[in-house]
Every structure is written in structure tokens, then in C-alpha cells.
Amino acid sequence: MVAQQLQERCGGTSQEDPVETTKSLICALNYISRDLPLPPHLFTAVSSIYHGASSSSLSDSDVSPPLPTSPPANKAPYGADLMGEFEDALLKQRPDCESGSRLIQLLDNRNKSHIQRRLSELEELPSTRGEDLQAKCLLELYGLKLRELQGKVRTAVSSEFWLRLNCADVSSQVFDWGMMRLPRPFYGVGDPFAMEADDQFRKKRDAERLSRLEEEEKNLIETAKRKFFAEVLNAVREFQLQIQATQKRRRQRNDGVQAWHGRQRQRATRAEKLRLMALKSDDQEAYMKLVKESKNERLTTLLEETNKLLANLGAAVQRQKDAKLPEGIDLLKDSESDLSELDAPRSEPLQDLLPDQDIDITESDNNDDSNDLLEGQRQYNSAIHSIQEKVTEQPSLLEGGELRSYQLEGLQWMVSLFNNNLNGILADEMGLGKTIQTISLIAYLLENKGVPGPYLIVAPKAVLPNWVNEFATWVPSIAAFLYDGRLEERKAIREKIAGEGKFNVLITHYDLIMRDKAFLKKIEWYYMIVDEGHRLKNHESALAKTLLTGYRIKRRLLLTGTPIQNSLQELWSLLNFLLPHIFNSVQNFEEWFNAPFADRGNVSLTDEEELLIIHRLHHVIRPFILRRKKDEVEKFLPGKTQVILKCDMSAWQKVYYKQVTDMGRVGLQTGSGKSKSLQNLTMQLRKCCNHPYLFVGGDYNMWKKPEIVRASGKFELLDRLLPKLRKAGHRILLFSQMTRLIDVLEIYLTLNDYKYLRLDGTTKTDQRGLLLKQFNEPDSPYFMFLLSTRAGGLGLNLQTADTVIIFDSDWNPQMDQQAEDRAHRIGQKKEVRVFVLVSVGSVEEVILERAKQKMGIDAKVIQAGLFNTTSTAQDRREMLEEIMRKGTSSLGTDVPSEREINRLAARSEDEFWMFERMDEERRRKENYRARLMQEQEVPEWAYTTQTQEEKLNNGKFHFGSVTGKRKRKEIVYSDTLSELQWLKAVESGEDLSKLSMRYNRREENASNTKTSTSKKVIESIQTVSDGTSEEDEEEQEEERAKEMSGKQRVDKSEEEEEEGEEENDGKAIFKWNTHKKKRSRYSFTCSSSDSRAQSSNGSRRK
């Protein structure tokens, strides 16, 4: 019955099941470990395991199991029998296990058998296997054979290490009596008195032995030390002798090497100087010979690559010359595939870039003379001017005078371009008569080539009257029309041209080229002449794109007096306009000159390599450009001298200058004590240098004769200078960037009874010619001509004046140069003196220094053929930060005396003494009063205090967020519109200014919702502005301007465009446009537009 219950409790399995048996034993063990009696069924199960048979069955399940009773006295206790039976059961169930030592032995035997088997396998391996596998097998075989030796070595090493670690100091351990263990103690052995004597004797003996050992050890140490020092000294002496001998041999060797290198350097220096002299003198034959002798790898590589380039360009130009133009229009569609090799990367082999005929040319050249590095240049030059025509006399149609010899040469060069079906650039220096040479070309083609035109002349608006006057003077028989004026006037001109159909020349300006494209593009122009061609240096401009893609033109000619800048991109832009199908990728154009050094880590160039690259670049453009300078062709033209006159600033100017540098605001006469916050701090500092009236409102009374002079250092200098120049018989051209300043100058000239004329961007086109005629009359009563640099510095003939005053210099020195050449040109009979007014220690000195750097060769950075004369926005920002840090500390320092200024201004000794006498008379008349306004005379409202927020910021004005341009009325050159939008607007006759402003505002409103980062900068600007800003006043004026009639609006936009004409001098700075309620944005602009913004703003106020 117990078996049945056990079977039921254990899942109904049989007793012989080992799993159930094990479970029963584990269950019994749990009871016994807790000192509990086994249940009957479990006891039966364990007993059956021990005896091998089940016990007697019990009764049915309804019979309860017997209760445990106490065992009889004559039997063993219940627990003893149970434990014995349990142990026997465990023994029966326990497997026959091996002992630990036996298992280790078995494991060792197994490892040995494996090793032996592996040894036999390795020994039986054939030797025909690979070398790597054979080497690995041999290493493994030797390692297994040396296993026992390795074990012995490890045992010996570990034993030795243990001994050295534990028995390092044997002598000290010998005398360490604590380590001695005697077999028996001394106590109780022998007589106590004898033991005491023995102890004393033993101590004495031990002490003697110890002292002897110490002495011996000390002697040994001393001997070893002396021996060591002796060896060291001997080694030092030997080492010193060796060093001396080595140094002597090294000196002898170095002296010889240095002498050899010195001779080589002298030889290389002489060769380099000879090469540079040959290169500067443009003696190519001698330079190539010297390069071959020097065996300079870099120079040879550069020459070979550029020689191949020139050969390829010559072949391409020849194909263009041979191309037949459909209907006389310059569309080289058939030659697109022939020119595709010029667009291929330079990394490909040259033979892959050339057509078959070019490969034959190159191979034949290499076979004839592989070292002729000038062959490519000869092919290039011969391909361009292959058809020559000698011009010895001027056309008979020219009636206004006789051409000079160099002008005849220019005419011959332009005729050569015409005969060779090419375009070019006439880049004579300003004042050499580019206009007359161009008119002579038109007359020559009309008279000798039978080319009546039509000719399209595109020029700045300021020089249109000059073109018309020159045509009327020199070739009155040629029908030249001026296409300008309001919409009704232009419409009448179009009807007249369309009705008669007889005209030779049409003269217009840049704006109408884009605005009236719908009409002008219908005419097939034979020649297009672009005056001031540097406007096309940016090939991405709307003007360049319009002229290239919108007009049908057979020939092109550029006129520019500005020298070609050392910029590959600008150079390529001009070539792209002249030959758009040859120079059609600026990237490939740069790669042509970068390729020789593309695979080298060192791309820095020497002076010779820089000069060589410049010469090779000029060789590319030289056949298309003709440039002569005044000192080369006009030997008898009077000289031009530039004098920098430095002046101090008045106390009012210094107050405003300090306020701008410290707080970015100036005090105004508002009655409320508020000040005016400013933007574009560089422009504000320049206004401080000119006159404090530029900050005051229109209600301020400027008609104060003493104050208008004493408030400005420059006006004070003018007040001393002008009477002297008028008495000496000189006439003056005064140029300024700011039209508001010209307004103040007009007040000063009126107060002092000086007769003057004025020309700026607001002057009408028909009035400009009249103003020039009035000033250039023989007995003209006008003493001074006031001109804005942008509008009056281009194409005006004012050689009747012999003095030029640059009131405030331009960032771009070319603008000042052009302004100076209005007087220094053909027809000038007097020495021209140019006075540049500069406030001492101010931002104007920085501007002047930057202009000098740009004019010099040191401002050019050349790396692997790349030319860069621009400074980055970071450079401009650092310059402004330096000015702000310097503040007013250097204002008024090193101001020249009156005598020094007289010495600089006088052109003769008599003039100097006359100026001295006039100064003395003036000083006596003024009773030696101070010429400039002092601190106590500055109006109280001119001072401003810091706001609470500025005080919290320790008065440090954060100028970094407001160094941008002022908001000016947007002049549209259609760059803000897409090509499709612009074409639609032009053909439909819409106002491009209004359309562009509408699209611009839409973009700004969209960007305003997306850009959240600009809010912090806007808030910073708001904290600096307490009163009405100058930009808000300008916006109100713009709104009033929009209400003008259509006639006035068209005229104003045209004149403001003329005022804003300028070339990009590449000086980019950070600009923040005016923050207004509806939009805010920031952008990047060109630094030269500082003056453009000011000039344009002044014209609007005017």
C-alpha cells in the first residue's frame, strides 16, 4: 500500500525509475536535514531502495497510517536504523568515482598522448607544402619537443627569483639572532657564574668580529668607489678626445659643404636675378634660355603646361576666326563640339583634350624642338593677329582735329581685331582719348570697310553728353542718336529710328539696355562698344547676362581706364564677354594655372613664380587688350602730385566721435534730451570727420558763417586754402562721397561769395553737358566744381582745372584715381596738384592706408596661380574693432603747422611766401583767435548720456550687431528677380524698381517667419535706440517719393542708379539692414558701397 501511495505521490511512475528514485532520496534528505521524521510512504520508498524489495502492502486508503510509537527497549532507535539504511542507499546509488589525484594523472596522461600524436603528425607531414605553412609546422614541432626543457627552465628561474627575493641580504640575516633557533635553552645548564663569563666573552668576540666585518665592508666599498670613479674619469677623457676629433672632422666637412653651397647659392642667385631681369623686361627668349640652363623643375613644368594651353587656345581662336557666322551674328553653334576639349579636366592626358589636328600640331612641334617653350605663345599670337593692315592716316570723316601717333596705333590695333574677326579691350589710361579712338574706328569702318553700322554704345549716364559732343565735334556727318530721357521721349526716338531707319550710332546707358531690351534686341547690331567695361567684371550681373544672351551682336569692344586686377575670375569675366565660347568656364580657367602644382604638397610660390604666372596670364589676354599709360605716350603732359593734408578735429567733432565709438549714438537738438542711434559705425565715424552738421536735422540753422567753419577741421583747412588758391589763379575740382556734405559745402561757398557748379547723381543728363561747357569756357567765372565721386568721377573732361581736392577718400582707390584724372588728361597745360584731406588719428587714416595697400603689389596673395586682392569680412570687422578700441586717444595728434601746409600746397617759392603773408594777415585780422570750436562752445544738446541698460552693461557698446549698412532705396538691376520674371517684366514695360521691391519684401517677410535667431539681435538694436532713427526718416521720404508723378519717379530712379554705379572692389563686410516693423534681415555687401549708400542717401535728401 505504501508503494502504491509512493507511486501516486511520485506521478504514477514505477519504482525502478531512476529519476523518481532520486527524487525520493532528495525528499528524504530534506526531512532528515531538518530533524523531522519521515512520512510512512517515504520511509517505505527508501527502505525498498535499500532492501531491493517492497515492504508489505498496507491496507486500503481509508485505513489511516499507524502513528509512530516509541521503539521497544530491546531494539535500536528509530533514527539509527533510518540513518544506516539511508547511508547504504546512498552508497548503492553513488557511481564509482575516481579520486582527485587519479583524475589529474588521467588528465596528464591524456595531454601527453595528444602531444605525442601531434608530434607524430607533424613529423610525417610532407615537405611539399607552402613555405608559410611549412614554417608554422616547424615552429609548432620544435615547441612541442622542447616542452620539458621549457618547464625545467621556468622552475629554475622561479626558484632563483624566490631565493633573491627572500635571501637578498645574507650578511644581515646571519647576525640576526632572532632568526636562530637553538635546540635547547641555556637555562639550567652549567654554573651561573661561568655562564656570565661566557656571555661577556661571547659578546666581546661578537663585537670584534662585527667591527672587523664592518671595516672590511667599508674598505671594499671605498675601493669599489675609487675604482668606479677612476673608470668614469678615464671614460670621460676618452669621450672628450673622441668628441674633439669628431668635431674637428665635422667642422672640416661642414666648412667644405657650406663653401660648396655658398658657391651654388651665388650661382643660383645670379641666375635668378638674370631670369627676373629678363622676365621684367619681357625678354622671353633670354628667359627661356636661362630656365633651360637652371634646370628648375617647377618653372619648366609651369612653362610647359602654359605653353600647351596657349597652343590650344590659339587653335581654338583660329577655328572661331574661320567659322562662318550665320547672317553676320556671333553665334558659334557649329563650333561648340570643337571647343569642348577646353572644358575637359586638366587631369586627363593632353592628347585626350585635343582634336586630331591639334595632336598633330603638338607632336610635330615636339619632334622639331621639344624644348621650345615659346612655340605655344607664337602660335597663339599668330593665330589672333594673322591679318595685318597698316593705318598711317586718320579717316577723312574726322573733322574735329588730328589724331596723335599713339591714337593712330590704337586705331590700327582695333582694325586688326576687326579684320581677324575678334573682339578686344581698349584699356588706355584715363585721359588718353579712348572716346576719340573709338569714334575714329567707326569712321574708318564706315569709310574704308563699308560698314555703316548700326553701332551700339553703352556708357555710364554721366558721360553720355560727352559722347554726343565728341560725335558732333569730330564726325558731324555720322548720324548718332542719344537714346535717353523719359518714357515719352524714348518712345519718340524709337518711332523716329523705326520710321527713318537711317542711323549709324545709338548711344545709351546701362539701365536702358536692360529696361528697353524689348526694342533694342530687335536690331542686329554690328558693333557694340561698352564704355567703363570694368562693369562687366562680374559675369553673374544682370548687365553681363543681358548683353551676352539678349542681344544679337557681331563684334564687341570694351573701353576701360581701370587696370585689370590680378583676379582670375575678373579676368575670365572679361574674356568670357569677348569670347564666350572659348572662355566659358571659370573653374577650368583656374585649373589651367593650378594644374602644374596640383600634385605637390607645397603650393607656396616664389617671387619669380608669381611674376611668371602673372606674365603668362597677361600673355593670354595681351592679344585682346591694348593699354598705354600717360608717361609712355604723352611725354609733355604736365605731372600730377598728390599731397595728403592732415587736419585736426573740432571739439564738436571729437564729442560726436567719442559718442559713436563708446555708445553708437549722438546727441541731437530735439528738445527732449534724446539721442539718435546709429548704424554702420564706419560710415558714422567718417561723417564725424567731415562735419557735425551731417547729424543735425533740417530745422537747424546752418547759415552761420563762423560756426560752419569752426565746427569742422576740414572746413577750417579749406577756409585757409581756398583764398590762397583763388589768389594764385588755380581752379578746383572738389570730390566727396556724401551729397549731404556737398549741400553744406554749397552753404559755405555761398556765404564766402565763391562761384561754383555742382554735379551729382540728381543732375539731369542734358544738364551735365551744359555744366561742363560752362566750367570749361575760356573766361569761366566759376572757381570751383563740386562733384560726387560716383557720378562725377567717370568720363568727364575738366582739364581746365589744375587742382583736385578729395574731401573724403573712397575705400576703392580706383575711384579716387578716376576722379583725379578728370583734370590730369590730354589738354592739361598746368601741373595738377591733388589734395587729400584726412583727419589725424581717425578712421580716415585707416581707409587711406588700406587704399595704399590695395594699390601696391604687397596686397596681392598668390597661391598656386590664384590671385586675391580682397580682404574678408572678418578683416573688415577686426579693423572696425581696432578703431573702436582706439577711440579718441589719437585724435588731433601730429597735426601739421600752417607753414608745413603752405609748403605742401605751394607749387613755387613765390606761392609759398604769398601763402605765408596771407596767413599772417588773416591771423592779425582774427586777433589770433582759435580757429576750431572749443569744448565750452559745443552745444549742450550735442552731449548724450548713457541709458540705464548701457550702464548695466558698464557702458560697453556692442557694436558688432550694428556694423551694417543703412537702409537705402533699392536700385534694381533685376538680380533679385528670376530670369523668367525679369523677361516678362521687361517685355510688358513694368517698373522694375517697384517689382523688385515687391518680390524682395515678400522674400523678407517669408524669411522673417522662419528665422527666429535674428530676434535677439533685433532686441539688442532696440535697446540702443531711444529716439527716431535716421532710417525711419528715410523710409518716410521714400513713401513720399512713391507719390511723385511717373516722370519724376523714372528720372529719380535713373539718377540714383547712376549715383550707385561702382565696381566691386571685393571688400566684403557684414551688413545689417535697417530694422523695421515688418521685416528684418542681414546680408553681406561690398565695402565700397559705404560711399554708395551715403551718396544715394544724400541724393534722396536733396
UniProtKB/Swiss-Prot annotation:
It holds the Pfam family SNF2-rel_dom. ATP binds at residues 428-435. Expressed in root endodermis, cotyledons, young buds, developing cauline leaves, rosette and cauline leaf stipules, sepals of young flower buds, stigma and seeds. Residues 1028-1038, 1053-1064 have a biased composition (Acidic residues). Residues 415-581 form the Helicase ATP-binding domain. This is Probable ATP-dependent DNA helicase CHR12. Keywords: ATP-binding, Chromatin regulator, Developmental protein, Growth regulation, Helicase, Hydrolase, Nucleotide-binding, Nucleus. The gene is CHR12. Residues 55-76, 1002-1102 are annotated as: Disordered. Residues 1039-1052 have a biased composition (Basic and acidic residues). It comes from Arabidopsis thaliana (Mouse-ear cress). Its main location: nucleus. Residues 717-884 form the Helicase C-terminal domain.
